[in-house]
Amino acid sequence: MNGYRPSSSQHACQQNPSPDAGTASARLSRRSFLIAGAGALVGAAGRVRADAPIILGQVSLSFYAVAGAVVHEILERMGHTVELRQGPHDEIFPMLGDSAIDLMAACWLPEGHAAYWAKYGGNAMEVARLYDGARFFWAVPDYVPASEVASIADLAKPAVAQRMTKVIQGIGTAAVITTVSQKAVGEYGLDSLGYSLRPGKPAEWTGAYDAAVAEGRWIVFPTWAPQYLNRGGKLRPLQDPRGILGGVNHASLVAPRGRFQALPATTRAVLARIDLGLDGVTEMDWLVNVGKKTPREAARLWMQANDGRVSGWFR
């Protein structure tokens, strides 16, 4: 090997072996056997890990579900079995921290999920940047004049406060948009004017918006991008001069470092290339909430329409 040739003295030892040489040879054979056996065990362990189900965690909101569905589809195309874990933020992030899942879709950084990441992301890593431009904001329906309501601060104007629905419907208490919206109510002095934030289920949140629009009623709507209601241009974002709701984020597919490194190299490489874009997630979210597709169906439709982009992930 590597151009090595035994010397004549070595040949002589091989032709006339001494008892010591025989003992050494036996030791060498035993050592080779052990090394080969260990290699076989490592190979078997690698095959077992490659064949084991991949556990995908995601927050149970539709825009996370469609991003997760694309990851799910990609993994199945590569021959993996996928087990899905869904729940609110305060259930899924601890699973990431405990290495109880292989992947999680998705984490907003650097600000959106900063507190969760600081608490549960110490042994985790960003796998792929799924989309940029993610942000939280408050909005009003487009029929509310911008000349009267352009920023969150304008909600305190007497004429605006008189017309605006005072109950601001939010989503679950563990969601970051709920936390920052509650802070905004206080920071902008809206609580003293009768405004209040009411956490609820996603259906209650969208239901409050739909009911207000149907009645032409003024309403403030805490929301985010990507989200399907942004697709029609019927929501107008409000400025946040105090910066309470935070800045722009990117959303990443994340994973416990050890569990991700245990995945096959090809799988890791393909996952790292996934790029959905803000518009892609918005479109899939619209297919779920308006088109009444399942997240998996929405993911397949979007992937078919963007076949060239998806094929590039497998290059």
Annotate each language-model stretch with its function.
Residues 136-146, 249-263:
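A bilobed periplasmic-binding-protein/Venus flytrap-type ligand-binding module shared by bacterial periplasmic
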Residues 51-63, 80-85, 165-169, 271:
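Short, well-ordered beta-strand elements
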Residues 68, 87-123, 208, 227-234:
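Pocket-flanking alpha-helical
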Residues 101-105, 173-243:
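Ligand-binding pocket segment of bilobal, Venus flytrap-like solute-binding proteins
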